[in-house]
Curated annotation (Swiss-Prot):
GO terms for cellular component: cytosolic large ribosomal subunit. GO terms for biological process: translation. SUPFAM superfamilies: Ribosomal L27 protein-like (SSF110324). It comes from Rhizobium etli (strain ATCC 51251 / DSM 11541 / JCM 21823 / NBRC 15573 / CFN 42). This is Large ribosomal subunit protein bL27. One of its GO terms (molecular function) is structural constituent of ribosome. The keyword Ribonucleoprotein applies. Residues 1-22 are annotated as: Disordered.
Length: 89
């Protein structure tokens, strides 16, 4: 009888969906309030001035301005938003 016996199935072939983490706005880029600057797990980047820290450690802008990254003496990188200077009228 020319029958082919059923082959076993692989138990591999799955992967989790990517989480799209990382820097979304780089140094010098303009942001408005509410823009996400960094998506991260844990605090690889720390919040500086004019930014908020979400419960999932997302850093987001609280004011409009330009993104600034600073490394302090403790080795931590702080993310801030420098407000745009108001135009003199």
């Amino acid at each position: 009888m020319a029958h082919k016996k059923a082959g076993g199935s692989s138990r591999n072939g799955r992967d989790s969906e990517s989480k799209r983490l990382g820097v979304k706005k780089f140094g010098g880029e303009a942001v408005i309030a509410g823009n996400i600057i960094v998506r991260q797990r844990g605090t690889q980047w720390h919040p500086g001035s004019n930014v908020g820290l979400g419960k999932d450690h997302t850093i987001f802008a609280l004011t409009a301005g330009n993104v600034d990254y600073r490394t302090k003496a403790n080795g931590r990188v702080y993310v801030s938003v420098m407000p745009k200077a108001e135009a003199a009228e």
